[in-house]
Amino acid sequence: MRNISFMLMADTYKNTNPDALPDGLTKLTSYITPRKSMFKNLNEVVFFGLQAFIKEYMIELANDTFFKRPKEEVIAEYKKYLDNQIGSQSYDIGRIEKLWELQYLPVEIKALPEGSVVN
């Protein structure tokens, strides 16, 4: 059993981000960009670890601490967390209920091959 909840893997305020998006949005693209090197004359990074992250957190942790638990239990825990963090009128719990009902994360990930050198 992991000592972390999938529900706590994102900043709390991100639960309100969908309210800022236009109605009818069907696609959203995000990027992860490496920060500037802290070492002189070192301008490249190796891209690695995404496959392990997806497996451990986006599949196993999501299943163990969210999708495989009873819906009522998950929603009650999530509401308690969000109510304490951002207030009960600041979010739509229906989004979380729909995600639980879907039983998987509806994301498409496109990435460089593991081990790619990026500059």
PLM region spans:
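Ordered alpha/beta subdomains of enzyme catalytic regions
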Residues: 1-119
